[in-house]
């Protein structure tokens, strides 16, 4: 599943512009007692890095 997430392109919006990017890194964030989410780190063409939730996990 991890390879599937990293090889797919996602639409990322930053400062009003939309980019189709592949994540550099992805991880699961799941606080105790709450449903988890998959967060991904994207590198923009201008050199900045942003994080975005790309998937919600079932409870």
From Swiss-Prot:
Pfam families in alphabetical order: Cren7
Keyword match Cytoplasm: yes
Any single Gene Ontology cellular-component annotation: chromosome
Keywords: Chromosome, Cytoplasm, DNA-binding, Methylation
InterPro entries listed in its UniProt record: Cren7_sf (IPR038647), dsDNA-bd_Cren7 (IPR020906)
Function (record text): A chromatin protein, binds double-stranded DNA without sequence specificity. Constrains negative DNA supercoils.
HAMAP family for this protein: Chromatin_Cren7
Sequence similarity: Belongs to the Cren7 family.
Name of the protein described by the UniProt record: Chromatin protein Cren7
Organism expressing this protein natively: Pyrobaculum aerophilum (strain ATCC 51768 / DSM 7523 / JCM 9630 / CIP 104966 / NBRC 100827 / IM2)
Taxonomy of the source species: Archaea, Thermoproteota, Thermoprotei, Thermoproteales, Thermoproteaceae
Gene name of the record: creN7
